[in-house]
Regions:
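Short tryptophan-centered beta-strand motifs in secreted/extracellular beta-sheet-rich domains
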Residues: 186, 256-265, 270-272
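Extracellular, beta-strand-rich glycan-interacting domains
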Residues: 180-192, 308-333, 345-358
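Extracellular glycan-recognition modules
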Residues: 156-234, 325-329
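Short, aromatic/His-centered strand-loop micro-motif at the edge of beta-sheets
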Residues: 238-260
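Short glycine/proline/serine/threonine-rich loop/turn segments at secondary-structure transition edges
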Residues: 116-127
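Flexible glycan-contacting loops in extracellular carbohydrate-active proteins
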Residues: 282-314, 339-344
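Extracytoplasmic low-complexity segments
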Residues: 145-163, 336-423
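Bacterial Sec-dependent N-terminal signal peptides
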Residues: 1-40, 143-154, 423
Length: 423
């Protein structure tokens, strides 16, 4: 588990403080900075040092405490969703003294205990916002330098669904959506990258536009690896988003390694991100993108006829937004996000399931109309964390197509399926 000490106050220098004395934390002064460290299984320690800008003729008694408001402010300023570290994960002495004639107290030692397995599996960064104040308000604090955030980053683990052969994963919507700005994101790990003129589907969302009262199925998005027409490397995501024309990513994917894939449409400006880096940009062909409820988003195959062969496509942390997420928001919240975050329309963690039955297309591979022939199938069902959307499901072409659900996998971007940092 890694930790991060951060303070967001540019150019604070205690030597420049004039007027009445001020109280602050020595570590929280200067330019905005971060210090990372590893907390081993047997725990670790970190120290902070309360300081005043000018010596006093008397002892100054201090209180060191956890400031939840400082964490709220940090999250707002940095587009993060850090959650408060439980008090079972840390210990420190809350009292300190700056002796008369001195400007610093003895260092305050914070003992940190590693995150539990369950805390790691939430995906949330657990943060400890440490602050200092004078007892009895005997001295004002130096605003912006009186607190810092100690952030314990989890090693992200999850149970993972694997799509194989003649099957696909589908997240349907409760209603059709017409959106001028939106975001789709997922964690993705392909077991291998095909060679040759073979197309496989990372994800697709069937949409439509209306022309003369007729629905034309051409909107939404499709993200492919490879192209049946050839000429596109199978490691490069290609396809079309909101009728923007075929685009090809400049960033190759790697087999058996976790990637964060995102499409952001901001009022018609489209960006494909791979691990927070721009794969390509494009312009939407329409003022708004329409998504069809019965199709939602499909993963692994365009249909149950299958084109994955022996591949296994692994997914988790699937999210669909009615807002354009910034690259900072994408990068800071890869492994978890609060289910009540504004603009979050659907959130399928895919980390647990129930077994049940669902209606899927019968003779047709795509639900493009309400009267599409449907048939009932046994399946896995995956809850939407927001409660706004129906369960996601797996459609398989035959009972011989297996369900594969692998527990406790490290899903960190850049790590292999076996949990090793890729070279």
């Amino acid at each position: 588990m890694t930790g991060l000490v951060s303070c967001d106050n540019a150019e604070l220098k205690y030597d420049d403080v004039t007027g009445p004395g001020r109280l602050f934390l020595n570590e929280a002064v200067g330019t905005a900075k971060s210090v990372s460290f590893v907390i081993p299984d047997d725990g670790s320690v970190y120290t902070v040092t309360p300081r005043i800008s000018k010596p006093l003729g008397r002892d100054l008694k201090l209180t060191v405490y956890v400031d939840e408001k400082a964490l709220d402010e940090y999250n707002k300023q940095n587009n993060t969703s850090y959650t408060l570290l439980p008090n079972t994960n840390y210990e420190f002495e809350s009292s300190a003294v700056i002796p008369a004639g001195k400007v610093v107290s003895n260092p305050v030692t914070i003992t940190l205990h590693p995150l539990t397995t369950e805390q790691n599996k939430t995906g949330f960064v657990h943060a400890l916002p440490i602050a200092v104040k004078a007892e009895g308000e005997a001295m004002q604090v130096l605003e912006g330098a009186d607190a810092f955030v100690l952030a314990a980053t989890p090693v992200p683990y999850s149970n993972v669904v694997e799509i194989t052969g003649n099957s696909y994963l589908q997240t349907r919507f409760a209603e059709d959506y017409k959106l001028s700005s939106w975001t789709f994101e997922t964690l993705f790990n392909p077991s291998q990258i095909y060679t040759g003129n073979t197309t496989t589907w990372l994800a697709s969302a069937i949409g439509y536009y209306e022309q003369g009262g007729t629905k034309i199925i051409q909107d939404g998005f499709m993200l492919r690896l490879g192209d049946s027409g050839g000429g596109t490397k199978n490691s490069l995501i290609n396809g079309m988003v909101s009728r923007s024309g075929k685009q090809i990513s400049s960033i190759p994917l790697q087999s058996n390694i976790w990637h964060h894939i995102a499409i952001v449409c901001d009022e018609g400006d489209i960006t494909l991100y791979v691990n927070g880096n721009v794969g390509y940009t494009a312009k939407s062909g329409y003022a708004a993108t329409q998504f069809y409820a019965l199709n939602g988003i499909r993963f692994g195959n365009e249909s149950a006829s299958g084109n994955l062969g022996s591949l296994r496509y692994r997914y988790c942390q699937v999210r669909f937004w009615s807002v354009a997420r910034s690259v900072e928001e994408l990068n800071n919240n890869r492994y978890a996000v609060p289910a009540d975050t504004p603009g979050l329309l659907g959130y399928w963690k895919l980390n647990e399931y129930t077994e049940g039955k669902a209606m899927v297309p019968g003779s047709s591979v795509k639900c493009i109309e309400e009267d599409t022939p449907m048939t009932e199938t046994e399946t896995y069902l995956f809850k939407d964390a927001t409660g706004k959307q129906p369960d996601a499901l797996i459609h398989r072409a035959s009972a011989n197509t297996p369900y594969i659900f692998t527990p406790d996998k490290r899903i960190e971007v850049g790590y292999t399926w076996d949990g090793v940092l890729a070279q």
